[in-house]
């Protein structure tokens, strides 16, 4: 890639950077700690990568160099679980007497409030 038999010459690097600037290209090293790339079925994680961003006429290109670890993607699907709260007769009587409603109305309000006495009483009070 480099002229001169592949030997790296710091002066040549300076000339290349100047040429890049002349063509509207600018390169900058980023101090990245970790880079994560999320694919459809896996995740690539680069620990201690070398990241360089090149700006070419307003378009930025990121270059990541380092060793990638493949990580299995966790299944994101969470099933809805319906929780049924058991309402006690004591709670029903308390809500019924506090709000002056029938036991059926009190039970319904408690079920809608997932057993929360205060919420059921507030609901029936309005």
UniProtKB/Swiss-Prot annotation:
The lineage of its organism: Archaea, Methanobacteriati, Methanobacteriota, Methanomada group, Methanococci. Contacts the emerging nascent chain on the ribosome. It comes from Methanococcus maripaludis (strain C5 / ATCC BAA-1333). This is Nascent polypeptide-associated complex protein. SUPFAM superfamilies: UBA-like. Belongs to the NAC-alpha family. The keyword Protein transport applies. Residues 10-77 form the NAC-A/B domain. Homodimer. Interacts with the ribosome. Binds ribosomal RNA. One of its GO terms (biological process) is protein transport. Keywords: Protein transport, RNA-binding, Transport. One of its GO terms (molecular function) is RNA binding. NCBIfam families: archaeal-type nascent polypeptide-associated complex protein. CDD domains: UBA_AeNAC. InterPro entries: NAC-like_UBA, NAC_A/B_dom_sf, NAC_arc, Nas_poly-pep-assoc_cplx_dom, UBA-like_sf. The gene is nac. Pfam families: NAC, UBA_HYPK.
